[in-house]
């Protein structure tokens, strides 16, 4: 019987740094980007990638899929803004407010519950952006 090795990806942080440098060349001066590093940096290591690019001036912050990923980035020492792209369950609201992690809100009731938690923690938390205005 033939033996097949598992497929694996070997990622060079130098290559990632190079790729971010190339992206920077293609964005307008003063423009900031959000680095999406969900799913453990798509399997390349969210912690290593976050540590590498955290200091880049054109990185506004990071986007992840879940509350767990966001909390993990905070535990790694990420201080820039973190946006969760997926659904966050109410049980995570206290941690999200405390850690200043941003959520996408899809229902008014969710905004109300987040607001209640922010008031409980005596923090300003909710910002509403009207993207329909030009």
Model regions and ranges:
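Active-site-proximal beta-alpha core segment in soluble small-molecule metabolic enzymes
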Residues: 2-11, 15-18, 31-134
């Amino acid at each position: 019987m033939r033996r097949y090795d598992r497929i694996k990806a070997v990622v060079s942080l130098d290559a990632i740094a190079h790729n971010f440098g190339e992206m920077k060349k293609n964005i307008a001066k003063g423009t900031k980007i959000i680095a999406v590093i969900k799913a453990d940096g798509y399997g390349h290591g969210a912690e290593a990638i976050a540590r590498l690019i955290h200091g880049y001036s054109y990185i506004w912050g990071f986007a992840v899929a879940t509350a767990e990923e966001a909390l993990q980035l905070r535990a790694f020492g990420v201080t820039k803004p973190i946006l969760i792209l997926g659904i966050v369950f109410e049980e995570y609201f206290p941690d999200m407010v405390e850690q200043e992690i941003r959520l996408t809100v899809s229902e008014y009731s969710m905004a109300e519950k987040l607001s209640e938690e922010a008031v409980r923690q005596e923090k300003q938390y909710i910002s509403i952006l009207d993207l329909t205005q030009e």
